[in-house]
Every structure is written in C-alpha cells, then in structure tokens.
C-alpha cells in the first residue's frame, strides 16, 4: 500500500469531481448502468452512493474568490418522493468539526421552512441566531441529495438553484 500515491490519486479524482459541479448522473448502480469514468470519480468523492432511481446527487461550491463569503441557497419544491439533504465538505471531501453549532448537514425534516414553505439555507457566517446555517470549512463545497427523485430530476428537467454570496443578493 502506497499512501502517498493513494492520496495523490484521490486528490486528482476529487478535482475532477469538483469540475463536474452539477448533477452527477448515473454514477452508482450495476454494471452496464453507470458510466465507468464518472463512477470512478464519484467513488473517490463519495463511496456510499445509491442507484439513480434511489438518489440523485448535485455537487456545487463557491465561485473562485467567493469561498470566504457567506452564501444563501433557497430550496422550494424539490421534486422528490422521499426527502432532500445538503451536506458540506472540506477541500479533501470530508465533513469536519465546526465549533459550537455542530452542523454539517440539513434536510427538509430538520431544517425550518419559511412561511411560504421554501427553505433558506445559509452557508457560512453562522451564529446561534441564524436558522438553517451550516458553517463552511476551508475549501468548502456541498452536495444536494434528492432521495427517490421524481421523473423531472431523472429526466434532467429540474436543476437545483446555486448558492449565491449573500452580498450579491442584497446589492
């Protein structure tokens, strides 16, 4: 086992995964159901994936130069037959301890909806008074999972909104 070679290979695959920054497509499932290269990249990013009919994965992160700014993501009517979740990861693809809030993920079960039923998720700039806030580690990115996705996700008709820096939303 060559740990240095393993780490270098995983870092390269993580970079490829970050370049995809979008719907990860058919990356988990049986032989003949997945794209082999996408599967290789996806297993470096997240080893425990489900077939497309059980979960769809959307990766995203801040634009260059915006990583230190708090971001906002508004989710409404995510077309799933089960639930959705958002998980934040560091630059190495891991969840990390993040202080007193101890939050790395939110979903439509544990997040607080707004009056209109949508969810405002804040990424970074957190304190105990901000609802639905996930602290952002250095080099952060996030993954939106849609469990038991509806046909609109499976056909590619629905795409999630991107998190935007909060300052851009208030200008």
Where does each model-flagged region fall?
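A compositional/structural signature for long, glycine/proline-rich flexible linkers
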Residues: 1-171
């Amino acid at each position: 086992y060559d740990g240095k070679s393993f780490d270098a290979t995983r870092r390269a695959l993580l970079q490829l995964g970050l370049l995809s920054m979008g719907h990860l497509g058919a990356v988990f499932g049986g032989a003949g159901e997945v794209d082999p290269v996408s599967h290789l990249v996806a297993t470096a990013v997240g080893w425990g994936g489900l077939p497309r009919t059980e979960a769809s994965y959307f990766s995203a992160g801040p634009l260059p130069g915006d990583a230190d700014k708090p971001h906002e993501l508004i989710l409404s009517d995510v077309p799933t037959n089960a639930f959705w979740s958002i998980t934040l990861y560091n630059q190495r693809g891991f969840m990390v301890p993040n202080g007193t809030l101890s939050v790395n993920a939110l979903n439509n079960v544990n997040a607080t909806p707004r009056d209109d039923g949508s969810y405002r998720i804040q990424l970074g700039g957190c304190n105990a008074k901000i609802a639905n806030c996930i602290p952002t580690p250095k080099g952060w990115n996030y993954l939106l999972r849609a469990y038991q996705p509806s046909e609109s996700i499976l056909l590619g008709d629905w795409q999630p909104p991107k998190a935007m820096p909060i300052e851009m939303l208030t200008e």
